């Protein structure tokens, strides 16, 4: 069975019914997933979905591209969401220097607050690092980091990977690891210790081969797993077992 460690169900449900989405996921052997929030409203919706569907857990946080919305009020609302058992992670937070929607200092300030929330609630920090991996690692190295870190949709260099692993982080790979041009990601996947490896869809974005060009969904995480298995010269079933066990461990789930 597979575990999708990062999907945006609040976006997916704009185009498909969640019941259909979950049925296709089950058909593809996906039995658990984490619905990721990117601002207060989507974090609240992710919790609603998790309460309605036992196979879903959720996260709460504000994406760096929305960091201008971060305030004492939004932090208080995220803090309250994190008190719920169904909310198993803080984020998606981090830094995004690619789109540059938000001043870097504003992103960094919001990221630092999320770091403290993760420490306070003892929940893993889900980190977005588009064109900003080194800067995000620097922020974590400058403080006592949370004990559980997840670098989502890994895209960093080999040196950055070593630094992230030195922090004790888990590394999550998305559908782009299956792209023909992504040999650098497959190289990274080979270097990650088995007990730190996660997979995700980042639905509805980054659909893996052979679904590339379609809206992504949790059921496609098996294709991500197959790409990882091929890159690591491992059995697909072993990758499914390992990544599912890792996800359940870092999110604090019994099963």
Regions found by a protein language model. Give the residues of each.
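Mid-domain alpha/beta scaffold segments of enzyme catalytic cores
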Residues: 1-255
């Amino acid at each position: 069975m597979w575990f999708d460690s990062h999907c945006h169900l609040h976006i997916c449900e704009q185009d498909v019914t969640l019941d259909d989405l979950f049925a296709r996921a089950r058909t593809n052997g996906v039995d658990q997933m984490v619905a990721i929030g990117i601002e207060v409203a989507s974090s609240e919706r992710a919790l609603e979905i998790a309460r309605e569907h036992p196979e879903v857990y959720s996260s709460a946080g504000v994406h760096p591209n929305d960091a201008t919305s971060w305030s004492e009020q939004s932090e208080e609302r995220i803090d309250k969401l994190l008190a719920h058992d169904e909310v198993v992670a803080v984020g998606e937070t981090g830094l995004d220097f690619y789109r540059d929607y938000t001043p870097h200092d504003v992103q960094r300030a919001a990221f630092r607050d999320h770091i403290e929330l993760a420490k306070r609630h003892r929940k893993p920090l889900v980190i977005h690092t588009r064109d900003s991996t080194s800067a995000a690692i620097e922020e974590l190295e400058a403080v006592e980091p949370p004990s559980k870190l997840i670098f989502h949709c890994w895209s960093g260099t080999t040196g950055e990977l070593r630094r992230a692993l030195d922090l004790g982080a888990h590394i999550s790979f998305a559908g782009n690891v299956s792209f023909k041009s992504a040999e650098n990601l497959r190289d990274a996947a080979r270097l990650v210790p088995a007990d730190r490896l996660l997979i995700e869809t980042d639905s509805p974005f980054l659909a893996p081969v052979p679904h590339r060009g379609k809206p992504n969904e949790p059921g496609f995480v098996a294709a991500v797993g197959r790409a990882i298995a091929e890159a690591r010269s491992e059995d697909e079933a072993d990758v499914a077992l390992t990544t599912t066990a890792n996800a359940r461990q870092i999110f604090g789930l019994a099963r």
